[in-house]
C-alpha cells in the first residue's frame, strides 16, 4: 500500500477555520465529577458554515451506523438516531443569553490524551497564553457511539487543534462541568455549577500578568 494514501474515516471531521473555541481546557486534563481527567473544548460553528455542519452531520450518521451493535446492547432493537444524545447542539436554543453562541451550533469535544496544537503554519504552539477561549481555528474531531448503563448516544472526541487567528476573549455563563458532565460517555447528569472553568481562570491570570494587568477573560 502506498504510504501517502490517506484512509478515509467517515467519522472524522476537520472543522472550518472560523470555528471558535470556548471553554478551552487544552493544556492540562481536568477531572469532572471525580471522573477520568480529560482535555476539552467547546467548538462554536456559525450556522453559515454549512460545509462544516454537513460534515459533522454525516460523521454522526456514520458513527451511529458503525455503533449499532453497541447502541442496541441487550435491547431488542437499535434506538433511532433521533432519540439518542447527539453532540451537535443549537446555540440559539441552548445558549440564548450568550452572544458568542448566537446563530451558531456547537460541539463539545474531549479526550484523555493531550491534543496536538499548532499555528496557521502548522508549527507547534508552546506558549499557553496563545490559546484561550475566544480564538478561531480548525479542530480535528472524531465521533463514536457510546452505551453506558443504558445511557446511549454519539460523543465527540478531540484529536488536534490549529489556531488560525486571535479573537475577543470569551466570558461564560455555563460551566465546563455542566457542558461536559454527560456528553463524553453518558455518565453523570449535567448540573449548573457556579464556579468557572479552571483552565480559563489560569489562562486569564497568565495573560493578565503578561500584559501587566487587564481584565480577566471570564467574569
Q: What residue ranges belong to the model's regions?
A:
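OB-fold ssDNA-binding interfaces and closely related basic DNA-contact patches used
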Residues: 1-106
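Residue-level recognition of well-ordered beta-strand positions that form the cores
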Residues: 42-44, 108-110, 140-142, 162
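A broad, structure-centric signal for solvent-exposed, well-ordered loop/edge residues
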Residues: 52, 114-116, 163-171, 200-203
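Short, basic/aromatic beta-hairpin or loop at an interaction surface
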Residues: 106-120
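Compact mixed alphabeta submodule
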Residues: 118-192
Amino acid at each position: 500500500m502506498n504510504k501517502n494514501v490517506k484512509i478515509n474515516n467517515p467519522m472524522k471531521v476537520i472543522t472550518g477555520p472560523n470555528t471558535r473555541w470556548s471553554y478551552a481546557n487544552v493544556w492540562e486534563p481536568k477531572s469532572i465529577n471525580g471522573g477520568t481527567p480529560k482535555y476539552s473544548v467547546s467548538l462554536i460553528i456559525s450556522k453559515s458554515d454549512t460545509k462544516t455542519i454537513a460534515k459533522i452531520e454525516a460523521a454522526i450518521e456514520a458513527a451511529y451506523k458503525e455503533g449499532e451493535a453497541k447502541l442496541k446492547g441487550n435491547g431488542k432493537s437499535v434506538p433511532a438516531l433521533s432519540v439518542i444524545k447527539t453532540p451537535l447542539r443549537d446555540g440559539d436554543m441552548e445558549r440564548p443569553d450568550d452572544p458568542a453562541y448566537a446563530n451558531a451550533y456547537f460541539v463539545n469535544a474531549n479526550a484523555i490524551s493531550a491534543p496536538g496544537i499548532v499555528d496557521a503554519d502548522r508549527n507547534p504552539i508552546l506558549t499557553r497564553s496563545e490559546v484561550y477561549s475566544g480564538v478561531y481555528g480548525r479542530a480535528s474531531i472524531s465521533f463514536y457511539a457510546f452505551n453506558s448503563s443504558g445511557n446511549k448516544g454519539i460523543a465527540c472526541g478531540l484529536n488536534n487543534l490549529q489556531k488560525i487567528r486571535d479573537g475577543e476573549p470569551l466570558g461564560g455563563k455555563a460551566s465546563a462541568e455542566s457542558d461536559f458532565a454527560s456528553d463524553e460517555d453518558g455518565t453523570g447528569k449535567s448540573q449548573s455549577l457556579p464556579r468557572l472553568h479552571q483552565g480559563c481562570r489560569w489562562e486569564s491570570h497568565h495573560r493578565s500578568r503578561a500584559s501587566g494587568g487587564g481584565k480577566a477573560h471570564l467574569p
